[in-house]
Amino acid sequence: IAKQYGCNIESIDYTDIMNPDLRVERLLSVLQRESEDFVLVGSSMGGYVSIAASNSICVKGVFLLAPALYMPGYHIQKYNTDQSNIAIIHGWSDDIIPPEHSIKFAKRANCSLHLIDGDHRLNGSIDTVGSLFEQYICALM
């Protein structure tokens, strides 16, 4: 979807790192070389990585899918709630990361939150996710 709107896309390979906080460090090292505006998109642990990285670097936006916020064992528990252009999608039936975690963050950040029919992977709601992501990208342009 983002490519349709002329966005460049980079997917960082984290397969060699299981620790979410080390993934944040890798993302920050990649982003420090970036000269253009960018949006971070992350799902589950990737959502945590994206929002945690945005604590340390200026981003145009953050789009999160069932983000692993406020999870035990994750180092960062306070997130930058002052930035604009944060959107979250979370499935009501997520049995891995409670939707209440996204609700808690969205209240603090006063950001867009879409609670939709679906589990952690949101596979049954892919059309809805795609539509919401397209609206998000268009609003940033």
Give short role names for the model-derived ranges.
Residues 15-17, 116-123:
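Histidine-bearing beta->alpha loop at or near hydrolase active sites
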Residues 82, 87-90, 94:
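Short beta-strand/loop motif that positions the catalytic acidic residue
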Residues 41-51:
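Gly/Ala-rich beta-loop-alpha elbow adjacent to hydrolase catalytic centers
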Residues 71, 92-97, 120-121:
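Acidic catalytic loop of the alpha/beta-hydrolase fold
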Residues 101, 123-138:
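Post-His helix in hydrolase/transferase enzymes
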Residues 92-111:
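Conserved loop-alpha-helix segment in the C-terminal half of the alpha/beta-hydrolase fold
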Residues 58-70:
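A conserved short beta-strand
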